[in-house]
Design a protein with these regions (language model features):
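N-terminal low-complexity or simple alpha-helical regulatory segments
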Residues: 1-147
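Short, contiguous, pocket-lining structural segments
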Residues: 44, 158, 162, 252
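Short, conserved glycine- and acidic-residue-centered signature motifs
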Residues: 71, 163-166, 304
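Hydrophobic alpha-helical core bundles mediating ligand binding, dimerization, or RNAP-core interactions
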Residues: 79, 120, 167-170, 243
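Short hinge/gating elements
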Residues: 104-110, 152-156, 224-225, 245-246
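DNA-contacting interfaces and partner/effector-binding or oligomerization modules
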Residues: 135, 139-226
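Extended mid-to-C-terminal alpha-helical interaction segments
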Residues: 194-195, 199-357
């Protein structure tokens, strides 16, 4: 299934899209209203959209049909052509142009953040340098994180496209930063449900509300603590992509790995086996193993990582006898601890402590 893309462009915008089916055979679910909004952008720049529409294979009759739909690939082609031709990634929605490369600059500015929370805060703050017509904020209340878009100017005929684009862009960027799918708890849109409201279920899977006070995205706040998994090389490669980053690389939800690590580190006595870990996380052991496998991890592998980190810390920072270190790390005997430590590191605990390892 292909997802309706509200504003897709190469080099700068990250819009999750399932590419399991080729564009030619994918269903057309993206509303033609988005294409009509891009035509309005051309009109505001006093330019013709003919070339962009031709590249996207959108006929004038389709453009005039209020019920017409297009594929995500058509929308990507149209938006990319328009943003480059107009040199405006804001598509004329704001009081000033957003030159080609603006959103790539924002992505780079947040790349050095230690975790997703700080990266998104920077991204929202830096967005105000591009335009003050909208204000983006990230907030967290209890277990829920919210990205909000406050309109500070009349976006006119481009309002729906602009708000949908902003939400999709920040969600796609967040997924890309941590290399993980981020399920949405709810998306809020501050306008009545349009005739093509069904398309929004593809754009924002999860609970969806129209007529909210402002545009919002809500997701589990635990994702904010996840570290960024991208570097400058990744960014350069991403900026060379001709299509938005698809959702497939993010089908593995890395949040569970983080939760398992925390459980193993904070509750070692309760996490001797899979049943104990599963009980702490309120999932079945079958679900635990299956989801960890989907994320490319295993419970034993995570236990070894946590044990090794704990062992290194105790060996380096304390003078506890080796038997006590072994017990603190979760081994019943010093011998089994020595054997495991050698397998992990290639050296013995004693040599590691002395600095000879």
């Amino acid at each position: 299934m292909e997802v309706a893309n509200c504003a897709s462009l190469p080099h700068t915008v990250l819009v999750p899209r399932d590419t399991s089916a080729p564009a030619a055979s994918a269903p057309a679910v993206t509303p033609m209203a988005f294409a009509r909004a891009i035509v309005v952008a051309y009109e505001r720049h006093a330019k013709s959209p003919a070339t962009a529409l031709q590249l996207a294979q959108i006929a004038p009759t389709q453009l005039r049909d209020p019920n017409a739909r297009m594929t995500a690939a058509q929308m990507e082609t149209l938006a990319a052509a328009a943003m480059q031709e107009l040199d405006d990634e804001g598509l004329a929605a704001y009081g000033r142009k957003l030159p080609w490369g603006s959103y790539g600059m924002l992505a780079r500015a947040s790349l050095s953040a230690p975790d997703l929370g700080l990266a998104l805060k920077r991204w929202c703050r830096h967005h105000a340098l591009l335009t003050d017509d909208v204000r983006l904020t990230l907030s967290a209340s209890g277990p829920q994180a919210t990205v909000s878009v406050q309109e500070q100017a009349d976006l006119g005929d481009l309002r729906e496209l602009t708000l949908a684009f902003l939400l999709r862009n920040v969600h796609g960027l967040a997924c890309w930063y941590i290399d993980s799918r981020i399920p949405l708890l709810e998306a809020g849109l501050p306008f009545p449900a349009p005739p093509h409201a069904d398309a929004y279920a593809h754009m924002f899977p999860g609970s969806l509300r129209f007529g909210t006070r402002m545009a919002t995205l809500q997701f589990d706040a635990a994702y904010l603590a996840l570290p960024l998994r991208r570097g400058e090389k990744d960014l350069r490669l991403m900026l060379q992509r001709a299509l938005p980053i698809p959702v497939r690389p993010y089908r593995r939800d890395r949040l569970l790995v983080q939760q398992v690590r925390q459980a193993l580190g904070n509750h070692p006595q309760e996490c001797h086996n899979a049943e104990g870990v599963a009980n702490l996380l309120h999932v079945s052991t079958r679900t635990l193993h299956r989801q960890l496998k989907d994320e490319g991890a295993s419970l034993q592998g995570l236990k070894d990582e946590v044990r090794l980190e704990r062992a290194r810390d105790l060996l380096y920072r304390s003078t506890k006898p080796m038997k006590q270190v072994a017990a603190a790390v979760g081994f019943q005997s010093e011998k089994s601890f020595n054997r495991a430590f050698r397998q992990w590191t290639g050296t013995t605990p004693a040599k590691f402590r002395s600095g000879d390892g």
